[in-house]
A protein has these predicted regions:
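Domain-level signature for soluble enzymes in the chorismate/prephenate branch of the shikimate pathway
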Residues: 1-100
Length: 100
C-alpha cells in the first residue's frame, strides 16, 4: 500500500516535471527569438556579437535571483549554456544578413 502511494506520487511528480519542461521549452524559444532579433539589431549598428559585460550582467542577475535548490554555480553553468546558444543564434542572424 505504501509502495503504491509512492509510485503514484512519483508519477504525479514526473507529470509536474513534464509540465514544467513544456513551459521551459516555450520560454527558451521566446528567449531565443529575442536573441535572434538582438543579433539583427547588433548587425545594423555594427556591434560585436560577444558582449562580455552583458554576459556578466546576466549571470550575476540569475545568481542574485536564484531561490535554490540549485546552487549559484549550477545556475551559472545552465545560463552559460543558454547564453552560448543565444550567441550562436546572434551569429546566425549576422551570417543570414550577409548572405541575403
Amino acid at each position: 500500500m505504501a509502495e503504491e502511494r509512492s509510485v503514484s506520487r512519483i508519477d504525479e511528480l514526473r507529470q509536474r516535471i513534464d509540465d514544467i519542461d513544456e513551459r521551459l521549452v516555450e520560454l527558451l524559444s521566446k528567449r531565443a527569438a529575442c536573441a535572434l532579433a538582438i543579433g539583427h539589431e547588433k548587425k545594423l549598428i555594427g556591434l560585436e556579437v560577444y558582449q562580455p559585460s552583458r554576459e556578466a550582467e546576466v549571470l550575476g542577475h540569475v545568481q542574485r535571483i536564484n531561490p535554490g535548490p540549485l546552487d549559484n554555480e549550477a545556475m551559472k553553468r545552465l545560463f552559460e549554456r543558454i547564453i552560448d546558444e543565444a550567441r550562436r543564434l546572434e551569429r546566425v542572424a549576422d551570417t543570414d544578413e550577409q548572405a541575403g
